[in-house]
UniProtKB/Swiss-Prot annotation:
InterPro entries: SmpB, SsrA-bd_prot, SsrA-bd_prot_CS. It comes from the Bacteria. It comes from Streptococcus pneumoniae serotype 2 (strain D39 / NCTC 7466). The lineage of its organism: Bacteria, Bacillati, Bacillota, Bacilli, Lactobacillales. Keywords: Cytoplasm, RNA-binding. This is SsrA-binding protein. One of its GO terms (molecular function) is RNA binding.
Amino acid sequence: MAKGEGKVVAQNKKARHDYTIVDTLEAGMVLTGTEIKSVRAARINLKDGFAQVKNGEVWLSNVHIAPYEEGNIWNQEPERRRKLLLHKKQIQKLEQETKGTGMTLVPLKVYIKDGYAKLLLGLAKGKHDYDKRESIKRREQNRDIARVMKAVNQR
């Protein structure tokens, strides 16, 4: 858990497998009352989510927030687009970095900080299959080395 983070509600583990994360930043989320109740109950799925910069605003798409059971008529559509709250300079920087460079914005983590839902947004570049295999191979080698070092240190 990074410095200053609150209770982690959801993580997107697949994003770190499919993308190389270049930079991360924290964004607020504009949610309705029933949506925040569902988020606090950890009923959120970030798996297919992505963010886009449109007209000077950042929008989060394909993130599923399950309808709140007791929300009845106030429930929103589960996969509606949601606005992300960032400073103007951050939005301009993201727009420059994602425009025509093969970079994308992926949600990495949702957590509650000081009573507000925050999203850890990653600036990412897609991995090819051979990059994924290389990452897996490197991780297994590190585990083997750690296992050997642990065995040596226990003697």
